[in-house]
Design a protein with these regions (language model features):
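A short N-terminal interaction module
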Residues: 1-37
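A broad, low-specificity signal for short, low-complexity segments enriched in glycine/proline
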Residues: 38-45, 53-55, 87-88, 113, ...
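Radical SAM/AdoMet-radical enzyme domain recognition
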Residues: 107-127, 135-219
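Canonical Radical SAM [4Fe-4S] cluster-binding loop centered on the CxxxCxxC motif
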Residues: 72-74, 78-108
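Residues that cap or initiate secondary-structure elements
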Residues: 87-89, 100, 133, 159, ...
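N-terminal [4Fe-4S]-dependent radical SAM core
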Residues: 27-80
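Long, contiguous hydrophobic alpha-helical segments, chiefly transmembrane helices and signal peptides
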Residues: 49-53, 79-84, 93-95, 133, ...
Length: 219
């Protein structure tokens, strides 16, 4: 059905590779997808499939290609923005720290970015900072208002708690990339004592609630 829907959006070789992967029970990507489905909250999994699989990958990409021809310019598949430059940590070598900690996008500004992005076919939004979760209330509002997009948050993990996880599960369209560097000693030398343990605690919480997350590693 994907080939019928997508047509010549991909090459015959691409479709053949996907078919081969689906038929191979030992394919690492199929194993990864199955593990995600097994360990993810059902509502979160459904929203990821709808927002990333259908809205972003299928419908969104077709809109993007059409709008590139209309406007004669490149349109990205995802948009990255910083809700705030504020942060509750002072990590050594942080590039964003050189810009100060007082810059903020208003809720209306962020709402406009997503609203106009969707009109062009963009349904995936990444947030960095600063620490985006300093603005967690506004992020939850955005996720609820735009429940057809996926929000991916790059975070130092320290502001993830039980109440926040419950809201993320209720909404279903927020995923996380947790910043961490190697061993506890290596990580805490750069980010401060106790940060590695805080990331492990956040991972345990996210896994407990079946929320999708990954890691962001500097090396």
């Amino acid at each position: 059905w994907a080939e019928q829907f997508w047509g010549n959006g991909f090459s015959k070789e691409d479709y053949d590779k996907v078919r081969a992967a689906i038929k191979d029970p030992d394919n690492r990507w199929i194993k990864f997808i199955n593990r995600v489905l097994d360990e993810t909250n059902p509502h979160v999994a459904k929203m990821a499939a709808l927002n990333l699989g259908f809205e972003a990958f299928f419908r969104g990409t077709k809109m993007i290609r059409k709008n590139r021809e209309i406007y004669h310019c490149n349109i990205p598949w995802l948009i990255l923005f910083d809700p705030t430059s504020a942060c509750n940590m002072h990590c050594q070598g942080c590039w964003s720290g050189t810009y100060g900690h007082k810059a903020n996008l208003s809720f209306d500004d962020m709402d406009k970015i997503i609203t106009e992005g969707k009109e062009l076919g963009v349904y995936l939004y990444m947030m960095t900072g600063g620490e985006p979760l300093v603005r967690k209330a506004d992020i939850l509002r955005l996720a609820e208002k735009h429940n057809d997009v996926e929000l991916s948050i790059y975070t130092n993990s320290t502001l993830i708690d039980e109440d926040f996880c419950k809201e993320v599960v209720r909404l279903g369209n927020i995923t996380f990339q947790l910043s961490i560097e190697g061993t506890p000693e290596t990580n805490d030398a750069r980010r401060g004592d106790g940060h590695y343990a805080a990331v492990m605690k956040a991972m345990d919480l996210l896994k407990k609630y079946g929320i999708i997350f990954g890691t962001s590693i500097c090396y």
